Amino acid sequence: PKPSSAASDVYKRQLRFRVVETAFKKKAVEVATPVERPSEYFAKYVFNKEKMFKYLPSKVYNALIDAIDNGAPLDRSIADEVAAGMKKWAIEMGVTHYTHWFAPLTEGTAEKHDAFVEHDGKGGMMEEFTGKLLVQQEPDASSFPNGGIRNTFEARGYSAWDPSSPAFIVDDTLCIPTVFIAYTGEALDYKAPLLKALRAVDKAAVDVCHYFNPEVKKVVAYLGWEQEYFLVDEGLYAARPDLLMTGRTLMGHDSAKNQQLEDHYFGAIPTRVAAFMKELEIEALKLGIPVKTRHNEVAPNQFELAPIFEECNLANDHNLLIMSLMRKVSRRHGFRVLLHEKPFKGVNGSGKHNNWSLGTDTGILLMGPGKTPEDNLRFVTFVVNTLMAVYHHNGLLKASISSATNAHRLGANEAPPAIISSFLGKQLSQVLDHIENSTKDNLISLSGKQGMKLDIPQIPELLIDNTDRNRTSPFAFTGNRFEFRAVGSEANCASAMIALNSAVADQLAKFKKDVDALIEKGEPKVSAILEIIRGYIKECKAIHFDGNGYSDEWKEEAARRGLDCETSVPVIFDNYLKPETIAMFEATGVMTKKELEARNEVKWETYTKKIQIEARVLGDLAMNHIIPIATQYQTDLINNVYKMQSLFPAEKAAKLSAKNLELIEEIADRTAFIKEHVDAMVEARKVANKIESEREKAIAYHDTIVPALEEIRYHIDKLELIVDNQMWTLPKYRELLFVR
């Protein structure tokens, strides 16, 4: 029989307290420490160069290594031998299936598992994995976000092997990193344009490096990500439908204690969390992910994981893999990992700092100062060209990290503002100022950590490691790299890396052209370089800001400087379709106008769908949880007032009931507001849903639905403070954030 409404309410209330009690009783899961040292089991499940050498013929091995290290074209004829070696290793490791593992425009990863088995022609089965299966498969392209490039009736798409990212084993499946493209050749994923952007920056940077060292043959873009996340007990998570459906809390009043004591950051890691981290690190190392750092973050139940930096494409694959691994391992420890940028209002959200740099095959970090004047001219050249790229494409870089989820975090006085600028620090700023203002070709002399000797009387010796840590800067120079801090915790790093590497590649090509033009006119090489650099420093001065990015004064100043100050995410996406953006991506060979248009359609559509889901969930919770609970408590208060009137004289009863009458009225007002605005929000959605343009529909959701969510939440959070705690069915912030 269906339980009565009263019985159902009691069950809901009991559920909250049961899951809290159960969570408190949970013990840390015991994690066995491997007998081997980490260096011995590192990359155990990866078909890396060591495994390639063992399982491939030497000719095939050399050809594959040449393709991986130097980008040499890979002859399709060797694919069968690579597949045979890969299959032999995988079967020895207990693998039964394989999959092409790719990153469609959904922000996550996709895979379809096929068994190795085929008919042997004799009524039995045999293990089979050919070069054709390794190199290419045909997933249904119309079933993934494609921005209109693929229709359901023309669904063919291809996933194609990326040899530069090694295959790996998860459970019983061999995962082969691949790109995903339409039948007509357009990229439908993140990896394909990322590889093109990395190739473009390699070529452009090598050309510029030849001014300083003709021996340079390859430049590699490096990425070191810092993954922030929250952990919530699985029982508490399940009792919050908003967390379950959207990844964030759509309601919930601040806990009396949150992060104001600053006692969580770098604090002792809770026992259950430490066990989770230990298992996660072991699994990550076996998959070749060089995890190094773990610690508590600022907010309660917020943590961070960071690896050693790697080549950008591989680092990005590893980040996608670690996010998948975190979700899986957390459940074994009774947690759910929250990768949403802002799961809880009132405490810090989560980001994913992207530490980006360029390095040569001769062992030089191009963003690091050197020991000779020539080295430091090279250093300044690459730093200033990066600033030029960020200046001319600051709107694009903002668009590359913008999303419905990251919008809650950016500019909230806890994360970088939604205006792209670059922090350089006092030392580097002085160097650039000197070059800008000098009238002769003074070469800068920096001697690394021993001190920065500038051979310039008016600038004293400085320590290069003394770059300040301006946490309010979205793109900060940190000694030998730039740290792109605006990237969201849930994002695919490739989006930001495609934009940044493409912009830098385009800028370096322009620099080479400008310098060569002066050299052709008879200008000495060093003078030509410094003259162009001097002009660039003046041109991109607006992007340099070392002050407080949280201040209102900076927003006004940024607007005066002509930087992109737009705050509407759907409008920010327009930066992808500006003529200068399209020209840049086409000049570097990274994406065509058609691909950019398709991606923007996906971005607008995804934005709309995420806000739409949040609106539906909040509406359901408001009508099915909040209003019934508040009304029930209101009824208890009304009954109390009537009993007071029957027990006491009218005047005394009125006095004793005054507060309850105020609460009754407040509950009535707030529930009426919630009901009225939920209904209005439903109607606003219906109006927006009729808009055919994905861009205009996303803007309508931003302008009407997002503010409605906040208004409804405000009144729900006020009711949470009024209603009897024993009646409130949903776990509160104090339980979600402090039960570990």
Per-range role (PLM):
Residues 24-131, 135-151:
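Histidine/acidic residue-rich metal-binding segments in metalloenzymes
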Residues 12-56, 211, 218-236, 241, ...:
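Active-site-facing alpha/beta catalytic cores
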